[in-house]
């Protein structure tokens, strides 16, 4: 490697400083977006959990076979909803989902099951679209505007129709979920069919309620809402975790840039000192020659 002049080193330091300013600004933007996303997420979770509890309790009282969205059957065909981000610069955020989904696909295929994918997020779409899988739908740019229930109702309708028509025997969500402001985990959750874990105590508690017009009709109306809202929650979880991951990635990049600036500043000072020393020696030698 050719030795750099002090001017070249100074130019490199200035370039790193420009990059550092960009990563610092991106960190600030991600932090602001994270706070906004967390407010939505913390409002979403209680409703989602309560809706699940309500459906779980109602499902105890009816024959599962009487409602197509509750029917449990052998999983010969599985739909996977893979949720990634549209953008990068978020550390291992997207690769974690892609790798987890890939392992799950290979596991299911090794068991002789058919796998179909519904992809949400450009990173996942770009990775899986040319891998030879059956792609149900592929969505990009969904995070440009705030995720809404109109969008998730469309996706939920597609998944419910496939399950009812027996094109799939189970539906799973694969996405990142926020654990703390600085940590997230990649989760695989079953969306369909709904699995009830209600206890006998719950059975006694719910049996005292009078439900109009009937448990079956109320449950039927809630099930599609449950599917739509679970998708909504998964997207909000993913979006919030993305902002957290990007904020941390940009924070690390800013710190690394600072370390690089310090390193190159030392090199610059040494190079400048050497240049000054060389110039002084040349001046002394020239003066000696004149004598």
Curated annotation (Swiss-Prot):
GO CC annotations on file: plasma membrane; proton-transporting ATP synthase complex
Pfam families: ATP-synt
GO biological process: proton motive force-driven plasma membrane ATP synthesis
Residues forming coiled coils: none
Organism domain of life: Bacteria
Family under the similarity heading: Belongs to the ATPase gamma chain family.
Biological role stated in the UniProt entry: Produces ATP from ADP in the presence of a proton gradient across the membrane. The gamma chain is believed to be important in regulating ATPase activity and the flow of protons through the CF(0) complex.
Listed name of the protein: ATP synthase gamma chain
Species, as recorded: Sulfurihydrogenibium sp. (strain YO3AOP1)
Lineage: Bacteria, Pseudomonadati, Aquificota, Aquificia, Aquificales
Gene (UniProt): atpG
